[in-house]
């Protein structure tokens, strides 16, 4: 058939080069001494380079020619599916890696000859088919100018691949070019060079690895965590750039394990998920805990779904461990947000390791996880979490007052330093909590008595009674008042040492002997006889008490509450050598303890120490039935910026801002503690 014009013949030039390479390795095959290890390995290396160029040639034809032809004609498909290039490359690599002895070389040579002859018999007709079948189809489906553009692109790609593969070795480059005759070179590059613009000729080819690290960092900022991990595998320079802290400020490993690769800053509060979704997560977590790796495989659909859930949780745990071991040691100081909400594989040890590696966290979300107090041991140092602004522990039902004590230390001390602080030495006396067995009183209740160390300052004040009601048998405030009177008598009958005498003494905050049980703000709670105030100056540790002073205004009759932290001539161990921490304002703005049913007034008082919470705007204490109105009042007094609309606590507590606060968020909630869950 008549030859096609050179301007639009897209196959002849590259095929000329491929045929030259076939002739070259055929000649070497007959001349190589396979019993000589040096000649054997040299021939295999040349074959590896040759077939790598073959594979690149086929890729260029697929991308620049065949894909375009498939778009125009649907009869063309899988043109290069069976060229066996990958199998040949694997054969050469195996020979270079595994064959060592002369006997193995001779056996391998026989196999190699058979495979090369079979490949050559297929490859030469394959190129002929492209020239005689597909070139006419290109002439039919493409215009003359389109074919010129296609050929230009094909030749540019071939030249680029040859330069990249051999530019590191000048001898190899010259040797490769010597295979081309002058006429062949002229034919191959005729329509690839003269149509370039002047700017394209001047432009030098630069490898991506030569880009400045500043530019790479700017590009990487547009990538997600999955793409960054892939870029880290390219080369050592890219690995170093991908470990830049600014690329990992916000971590969401649980979401990443589920295929959601969001890495931006945390937005507004998300809506609570529905009960069904939470239940499915809990079921998956239980299935993962009960999973037996050595058990027999169940092929049922239900078992298949369970295996899928277990596989997802395995990915989550693997990702969490990888972040702890590989990522955080390099970028932990730059991490600002860490969201681990709804993780079924998270442990307290993992959280403790993460917090120790991320000292500058501002946002921590542990919603509905199985962590305990030990997860926060790395915050025991004064100011260890001084930058923390958002802490969400919703649904963490293992959290107790110990976590709040640690949090109080970690947030730092913003109280005004005084000369007395420098003279304090002895540690404070601890608070002891006794739970005496009370006689039945018609309804189930429990009296928690906070006692002082015998001989401590302020020991003349009576103990504080905090009533813990049975959620199943709730009553109104009038019944509680009756329990208060009867509870005092019962305590005397128990005979605990010092209790009867303590009850006979008057509380330092009492101003009247009238009996009653009211905790509202319209009248001060210490105006009534047996209802003790519950303030820290009367019932908490003598080391760090919160004095609440009341100045009744002549016109309104309301109380102005002022709270300050003071030390009675003794010091906590944490207050030594902390002059650099004093005066720094605590940054906490959001605190959610929803469902943390073990939290008591003691924990709240501890958080209010060392300067209070001056910036706190959101406080959620839903599902915390052990808290009383007195404890809530102290938190409110220590949080001047608190937004009442974002203040949540149990509806059974007669606490501050009862008419304007948002109440309990856990009503009718199926996955968090609520005192009315029996309704």
Swiss-Prot record:
PTM: Ubiquitinated upon iron and oxygen depletion, leading to its degradation by the proteasome. Ubiquitination is regulated by the hemerythrin-like region that acts as an oxygen and iron sensor.
A GO MF label: iron ion binding
CDD domains, alphabetized: F-box_FBXL5, Hr_FBXL5
Residues where [2Fe-2S] cluster binds: 650, 664, 674-675
Superkingdom to which the source organism belongs: Eukaryota
Protein residues bound to Fe(3+) 2: 58, 61, 80, 126, 130
One Pfam family it belongs to: Hemerythrin
Domain (F-box): residue spans on this chain: 205-251
Residue spans of the LRR repeats: 316-342, 343-367, 368-395, 396-426, 565-595, 596-623, 624-649
Any Gene Ontology biological process: protein ubiquitination
Chain intervals for the UniProt region annotation (Hemerythrin-like): 1-159
Cofactors demanded by this protein: [2Fe-2S] cluster
Compartments, record wording: Cytoplasm, Perinuclear region; Nucleus
Coiled coil: none
Subcellular location, principal: cytoplasm
This protein's record includes keyword GTP-binding: no
PROSITE patterns, alphabetized: FBOX
GO CC annotation: nucleus; perinuclear region of cytoplasm; SCF ubiquitin ligase complex
Record pathway: Protein modification; protein ubiquitination
UniProt cross-references to SMART domains, sorted A to Z: FBOX, LRR_CC
Entry text on domains: The hemerythrin-like region acts as an oxygen and iron sensor by binding oxygen through a diiron metal-center. In absence of oxygen and iron, the protein is ubiquitinated and degraded.
Subunit text: Part of a SCF (SKP1-cullin-F-box) protein ligase complex.
Function: Component of some SCF (SKP1-cullin-F-box) protein ligase complex that plays a central role in iron homeostasis by promoting the ubiquitination and subsequent degradation of ireb2/irp2. Upon high iron and oxygen level, it specifically recognizes and binds ireb2/irp2, promoting its ubiquitination and degradation by the proteasome.
Name of the featured protein: F-box/LRR-repeat protein 5
Taxonomic source organism: Danio rerio (Zebrafish)
Species classification: Eukaryota, Metazoa, Chordata, Craniata, Vertebrata
């Amino acid at each position: 058939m008549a030859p096609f014009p050179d301007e639009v013949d897209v196959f002849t030039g590259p095929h000329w080069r491929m045929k030259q390479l076939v002739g070259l390795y055929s000649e070497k095959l007959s001349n190589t001494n396979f019993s000589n290890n040096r000649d054997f390995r040299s021939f295999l290396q040349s074959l590896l380079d040759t077939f790598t160029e073959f594979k690149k040639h086929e890729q260029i034809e697929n991308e620049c020619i065949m894909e375009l032809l498939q778009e125009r004609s649907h009869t063309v498909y899988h043109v290069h599916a069976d060229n066996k290039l990958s199998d040949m490359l694997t054969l050469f690599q195996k020979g270079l890696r595994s064959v060592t002895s002369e006997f193995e070389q001779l056996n391998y040579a026989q196999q190699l000859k058979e495979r090369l002859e079979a490949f050559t018999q297929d490859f030469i007709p394959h190129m002929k088919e492209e020239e005689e079948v597909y070139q006419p189809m290109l002439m039919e489906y493409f215009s003359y100018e389109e074919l010129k553009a296609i050929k230009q692109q094909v030749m540019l790609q071939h030249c680029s691949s040859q330069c990249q593969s051999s530019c590191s070795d000048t001898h190899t480059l010259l040797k490769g070019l010597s295979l081309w005759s002058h006429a062949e070179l002229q034919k191959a590059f005729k329509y690839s060079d003269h149509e370039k613009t002047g700017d394209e000729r001047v432009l030098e080819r630069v490898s991506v690895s030569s880009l400045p690290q500043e530019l790479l960092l700017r590009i990487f900022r547009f990538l997600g965590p999955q793409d960054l991990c892939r870029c880290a595998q390219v080369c050592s320079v890219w690995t170093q750039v991908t470990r830049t802290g600014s690329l990992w400020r916000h971590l969401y490993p649980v979401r990443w394990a589920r295929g959601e690769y969001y890495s931006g800053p945390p937005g507004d509060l998300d809506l609570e998920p529905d009960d069904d979704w939470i239940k499915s997560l809990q079921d998956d977590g239980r299935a993962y805990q009960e999973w037996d790796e050595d058990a027999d495989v169940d092929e049922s659909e239900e078992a298949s779904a369970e295996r899928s859930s277990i596989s997802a949780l395995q990915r989550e745990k693997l990702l969490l461990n990888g972040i702890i071991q590989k990522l955080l040691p390099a970028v932990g100081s730059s991490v600002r947000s860490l969201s681990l909400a709804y993780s079924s594989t998270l442990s307290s040890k993992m959280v403790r390791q993460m917090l120790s590696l991320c000292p500058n966290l501002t946002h921590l979300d542990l919603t509905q996880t199985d962590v305990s107090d030990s997860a926060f041991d790395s915050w025991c140092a004064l100011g260890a979490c001084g930058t923390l602004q958002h802490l969400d522990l919703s649904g963490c039902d293992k959290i107790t007052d110990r976590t709040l004590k640690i949090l109080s230390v970690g947030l730092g001390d913003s109280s005004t330093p005084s000369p007395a602080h420098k003279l304090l030495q002895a540690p404070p006396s601890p608070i002891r909590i006794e739970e005496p067995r009370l006689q039945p009183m018609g309804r189930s209740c429990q009296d928690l008595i906070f006692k002082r160390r015998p001989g401590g300052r302020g020991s003349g004040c009576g103990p504080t009674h905090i009533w813990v009601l049975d959620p199943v048998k709730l009553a109104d405030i009038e019944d509680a008042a009756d329990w208060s009177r009867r509870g005092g008598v019962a305590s005397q009958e128990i005979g605990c040492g010092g209790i009867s005498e303590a009850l006979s003494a008057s509380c330092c905050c009492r101003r009247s002997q009238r009996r009653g049980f009211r905790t509202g703000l319209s009248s001060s709670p210490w105006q009534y006889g047996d209802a003790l105030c519950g303030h820290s100056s009367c019932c908490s540790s003598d080391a760090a008490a919160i004095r609440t002073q009341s100045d009744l205004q002549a016109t309104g009759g309301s109380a102005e509450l002022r709270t300050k932290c003071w030390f009675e001539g003794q010091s906590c161990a944490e207050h030594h050598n902390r002059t650099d921490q004093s005066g720094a304002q605590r940054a906490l703005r959001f605190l959610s303890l929803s469902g943390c049913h073990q939290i008591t007034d003691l924990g709240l008082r501890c958080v209010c120490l060392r300067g209070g919470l001056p910036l706190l705007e959101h406080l959620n204490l839903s599902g915390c039935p052990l808290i009383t109105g007195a404890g809530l009042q102290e938190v409110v007094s220590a949080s001047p910026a608190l937004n009442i609309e974002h203040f949540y606590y149990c509806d059974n507590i007669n606490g501050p801002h009862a008419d304007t606060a948002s109440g309990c968020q856990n009503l009718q909630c199926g996955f968090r503690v609520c005192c009315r869950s029996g309704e």
